[in-house]
């Protein structure tokens, strides 16, 4: 078994092991946080391959590229699209500042509130940042599975 096949098998096994918890938390099973990017697309397909119960949700930011929205609607029509209560422009007016690297308030309002009370699947990679690398595959406090492809071999 090659490295990629091993990572896929590991991820599928982890999804299957945690499915009981996901179903206890929600009758829909996992809440898959979907962005249309390569990581969430890969995680979507891993969940399909695992045969686990999940529902994919995308939090629309109002600044998503039209090409991305067309891609999601055409290739992933089962993804539930959620519009924010307040759009990014109103949020900037309310905060009286643009989001910057040290003050990233926008995701807390537009994306991170989704999936509360569920086991949420996040397609993130350790290589993206030291903070993401420090995350565990399963975070019980938030009931989040990171979809890690970085397990020991």
PLM regions and their residue ranges:
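ATP-dependent adenylation/nucleotidyltransferase module used to activate substrates
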Residues: 1-153
């Amino acid at each position: 078994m090659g490295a990629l096949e091993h990572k896929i098998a590991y991820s599928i096994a982890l999804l299957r092991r945690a499915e009981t918890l996901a179903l206890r938390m929600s009758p829909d099973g996992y809440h898959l946080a979907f962005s249309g990017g390569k990581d969430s697309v890969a995680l979507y397909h891993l969940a399909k391959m695992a045969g686990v119960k999940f529902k994919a949700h995308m939090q629309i930011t109002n600044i998503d590229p039209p090409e991305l929205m067309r891609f999601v609607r055409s290739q992933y029509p089962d993804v539930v699209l959620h519009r924010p209560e307040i759009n990014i422009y109103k949020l900037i007016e309310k905060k009286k500042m643009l989001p910057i690297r040290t003050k990233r308030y926008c995701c807390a309002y537009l994306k991170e509130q989704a999936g509360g009370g569920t086991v949420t699947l996040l397609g993130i990679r350790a290589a993206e940042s030291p903070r993401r690398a420090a995350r565990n595959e399963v975070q019980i406090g938030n009931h989040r599975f990171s979809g890690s492809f970085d397990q020991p071999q």
